Curated annotation (Swiss-Prot):
It comes from the Bacteria. Belongs to the FliD family. This is Flagellar hook-associated protein 2. The gene is fliD. It comes from Xenorhabdus nematophila. Homopentamer.
Length: 489
């Protein structure tokens, strides 16, 4: 079969150009399909943009559900005797605090030992056991030692290996002492402070080692035995608004509730002059410190601002996707129209979201966004009234919580989060359903394009055959005509 470029060579007719025009006309059958593909792909992109904006609002709504974590408190300035912090249970208030005593961990010291590797137990005993008992521990520490494990080093390592409530260390008194000689001492220190960590030590199965380590506590901060108490166990003592408080540790977690006090030092005293029997006398008085706990509205305010910003971004996305640009009568639709103009899914999401946001909540004083301090502008976006919002956060935090989270019985406006979650569900959500339908339509269009191309190719092949035969026929007629003309001359 002749190529397109050679068509008409025999007849002198411009059949190649005619065939090109026929092919261009056939290709126009693809244009409606291509336009539909472009439109549906734009819709997919539009739904992707919409999903991104909805995800941001969903994330911001999820943060508002964590009201208790956001509804925080803060404390005033620096304090000499304690470092304060608060959790979600703290309530605003003023507290007068005096630190009377810091909690301390007990520390015991052995008698002098010559050399840290010298075996201190009776040989031939096989195994002996060091038992350390503390009132606050469920089980006593039991350290078993063999005959060759009774040096200070071995005892220290064996105790520390147990990882109980006791630390063991060695103090070398002689600067030039060796491991075999030189004054050394074993130090046992409770890891925890307070009187419930007072140690009682007993060595079973080795009287010689017992002469070095045995210690019996009297339960009152003292004791007797081979070891000497260098630091007595003590509980933390303080007063809060004049109420005496005693704890095992310097971290006071429940007085007042929701406030953590890390005690640093005992309160200083000052001399004040008072009248006693008509005479001025100087008496010592502790310098108390005032802890002021106030509500910290900034985290919640920031979360609300992020939520409003996310909503406004979504509103901008809605406007962009549904944009309509008028055209003259008979003109084609503008290319500037939104990708989801007239789309029912977009309208449905926008309508449901608006209903959720602006429906009145069952909260006495703060039933609407406007009463909360968030108003809707003419363009549909939201605007925060800082003064009104801050006043509500400071004075009506429970109502703000009920507005966003509900009161435990009735839902708050974070039901918007549930709507967004359903909308964005990857399997059955509104957007997933819409995009699934678009993808199915695109696959159908792809098959239609392939079939149309096959039909066009078949049609063009038929035209080529017909044009080739026509070229041959005209060429033959031309040759016959030329021969007859020569005969008739």
């Amino acid at each position: 079969m002749a190529s397109i470029s050679s068509l008409g060579a025999g007849s002198g007719m411009d059949l190649g150009s005619l065939l090109d025009k026929l092919q261009a006309a056939e290709k126009k059958r693809l244009e409606p399909l291509a336009q539909q593909q472009t439109s549906y792909k734009a819709k997919l992109t539009g739904f992707g943009t919409l999903k991104g904006s909805l995800e941001k609002l969903k994330s911001a709504s999820e943060e508002l559900k964590k009201f208790d974590k956001l509804n925080t408190t803060k404390t005033n300035g620096d304090h000499k005797t304690f470092t304060p912090s608060t959790d979600s249970k703290a309530s605003p208030g003023n507290y007068e605090i005096e630190v009377q005593q810091l909690a301390k961990a007990q520390s015991l010291q052995s008698t002098e030992v010559s050399g840290v590797k010298k075996l201190l137990g009776e040989q031939g005993k096989g195994t002996r056991t060091i038992i350390i008992t503390q009132p606050g521990e469920k089980e006593p520490m039991k350290i078993s030692l063999k005959d060759d494990e009774t040096s200070l080093v071995e005892i220290r390592d064996a105790i520390n290996k147990k990882e109980g409530n006791v630390n063991a260390s060695i103090i070398k008194a002689d600067e030039n002492g060796t491991e075999e000689e030189g004054k050394s001492y074993l130090i046992l220190t409770s890891k925890k402070a307070g009187t419930r960590s007072i140690m009682t030590i007993k060595v079973e199965g080795d009287d010689e080692l017992g002469k070095l380590l045995n210690y019996t506590s009297d339960g009152k901060g003292g004791g007797s035995g081979a070891m000497t108490q260098k630091v007595g166990a003590a509980n933390a003592k303080l007063t809060v608004n004049g109420i005496p408080i005693e704890r095992q540790t310097n971290e006071i977690k429940d007085a007042p509730e929701g406030i953590i006090l890390n005690l640093k030092k005992v309160s200083e005293t000052e001399e004040v002059i008072v009248k006693v029997n008509g005479e001025d006398k100087k008496i010592p008085r502790p310098k108390t410190e005032i802890l002021v706990v106030s509500r910290d509205i900034e985290p919640m305010k920031e979360a609300i601002k992020k939520w409003v910003d996310s909503y406004n971004e979504l509103q901008t996305t809605f406007d962009s996707l549904a944009k309509f640009k008028p055209v003259g009568k008979g003109e084609a639709a503008s290319k500037d129209n939104g990708a989801l103009l007239g789309d029912g899914t977009l309208k449905g999401i926008q309508s449901q979201l608006r209903h959720q946001l602006f429906a009145a909540q069952d909260v006495a004083d703060i039933a609407t966004l406007n009463k909360l301090g968030i108003k809707q502008k003419l363009d549909g976006t939201l605007e925060i009234s800082d003064e009104k919002l801050e006043k509500n956060l400071k004075e009506k935090s429970a109502d703000v919580k009920a507005f966003f989270m509900g009161d435990g019985a009735k839902p708050g406006s974070t039901q918007t989060y549930n709507l967004l979650k359903e909308t964005l569900d990857g399997h059955e959500g509104t957007i997933a359903t819409a995009t699934e339908g678009i993808n199915k339509r695109l696959k159908t269009l792809e098959r239609q394009v392939e079939q149309t191309n096959r039909n066009i190719d078949a049609t063009m092949e038929r035209y080529k055959r017909q044009f080739t035969e026509l070229d041959k026929l005209v060429n033959s007629l031309n040759n016959t005509s030329s021969s007859l003309f020569q005969l008739l001359r």
